Regions:
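Short, well-ordered beta-to-alpha junction loops that form the rim of enzyme active sites
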Residues: 80
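Conserved, mostly hydrophobic/aromatic
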Residues: 77
Length: 143
């Protein structure tokens, strides 16, 4: 299960909406070994595409160096789908290289439920196997 604060969830969704019609992407880093997403890091979609995302290799290298210096790891790796449901594509699965990360997808496609105008879903992707997991949104983390 992914436990994430409402603030972080809202920031991910806001990034997805702001970059629409292109796919948005980013990382939420957290202290190594805790599984707790804390530091929101929106990234530039180097592909600038409505159907594909790609982290800029220089930005990604910089982020991994920062995380290493801060004893962090990528807890959430997120991106948006602009015209389809929030479910990993074959390309998404092929790029999923962090077996302990939560892969979050947000759909900004039209026609979603009015009560919940976007889909926010989390998956584990290990060795090409996709497993959807529950998302628990909290106001703050407990100790």
């Amino acid at each position: 299960m992914l436990t994430i604060t409402r603030e972080l969830r809202d920031r991910i969704v806001a990034h997805a909406r702001a970059d629409h019609p292109d796919e948005a992407c980013g990382v939420v880093a957290g202290p190594a070994g805790t599984g707790r997403p804390e530091r929101f890091v929106p990234m530039l979609n180097a592909a600038r595409s409505p159907t594909f995302y790609e982290f800029d290799s220089g930005d990604l290298l910089k982020l991994y160096r920062e995380m290493d210096d801060l004893d962090e790891e990528p807890v959430v790796i997120y991106h948006s789908h602009t015209a389809t449901e929030a479910y990993p594509s074959r390309t998404d699965v092929s790029y999923a290289s962090e077996p302990f990360a939560h892969y979050v997808l947000v759909s900004t496609a039209e026609g979603t439920d009015e009560a919940d105008p976007y889909q926010f879903r989390s998956f584990r992707i290990v060795d090409g196997v996709i497993t959807e997991e529950d998302v628990q949104v909290v106001e703050a983390y407990t100790a």
